Amino acid sequence: MHYLQNNRAKSAPLILCLLIVSALQAGVTEAEIVDPTKRALHLSETLPNQTLKEHLQSCALGDFYPTDFSIAHRGAPLGYPEHSREGYIAAAAQGAGVIECDVTFTQDLALVCRHSQCDLATTTNILQTPLAAKCSKPFRPANGHQPASATCCTTDISLAEFKTLCARPAYSNNQAKTVAQYLAPQRSPVVSAPLTCGTLMTHAESIELIDALGRKFTPELKQPMVDMPFTPGFNQGAYADKLLEEYRAAGIAPSRVYPQSFNPDDIWHWINNHPDFADQAVWLDARGRRPGFQSSTADFAALQKQGLNIIAPPMPMLLALNDVGKIVPSTYARQAKSAGLEIITWTFEAGDPMDEKNWLYAPIATAMTSEGQMLQVLHVLANDVGVRGVFSDWPGTVTYYANCLMGLNRQN
């Protein structure tokens, strides 16, 4: 299919990727070996679509190859601390062809991989170190109806200080009375003993690692949570420029990079000022979460005319139920495709699909009758919507699907 980019020419079966894992983890906290088939087969057991279930299960013994259709969302956070070295290696071992670093900056303007500029309180061990004294808002225990909280930002500390911290699972207990209670351990369905001290990464280090793993890059320029310019001359444009300059400095071909942002101004800045990266700029479109938003083919056509090729809405913007309760492409999905835009979507394997509070499945909630129904969602996204890639918190499941049902094991 045209939207599946096969890395087979430069890749090996996943068993070889596991050997890469072993080599790259020498001297690093040991991570549990991952099996890309196990999770997919577990989910297939509760998949209502029997034809799809049997087809997926028939592929269990096949070779599995990396694919750009499988995009690692922050690494592999269903089992590893997000944006950790260990999580990135696990994602590559699961066949993710593209790996994400969410990019923000430290007090001394070093670019680092964090989902948010101010998430260190829950995604690192900073509250358990002397650096807690530098946090924007120190730990405050739960008190009556007031939940426990803390705010620690990358801009509170230097790069050298950032590198002393551990990456930890982004789980917290808002009823906690102490820091130890606040930093709740991860309960993972895929890793028996989740890491408690993963290795934090700078953006440059992530480039070096992902390049060594033979994968592509999708850095997201995170919205600053400080006033810009943060220092004289370091305005939003300089920040956006610095992200791309780190790929040039590392000698990475622009064709391997998919820079992303929720801020359309960042996208137009890249398109207008960095033509070598323009074709693969990805706009993360969250407009569908606004009350009353209505998409239109004319709007999508105008975006493409301005130079946008790839749009990346969340899954609920692409899915709907028809009159008989079947999952089908949404109006948004049909319009975007008819306007000629390519689509990437997020985030697969994020949260319980049967939880009514999980907004990722809100438009199709009544159809989500089992955990395995996620595979039906993936099937619709791949075949009916025609997305070119899916972000996943456990990319092995998407890799398995792509190898089994999208022709990866056939010669081109």
State where each predicted segment sits.
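Coiled-coil-like amphipathic alpha-helices with heptad-repeat character
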Residues: 3-5, 20, 34
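Bacterial N-terminal signal peptides
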Residues: 13-23
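Phosphate-group recognition and catalysis centered on beta-loop-alpha active-site segments
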Residues: 27-412
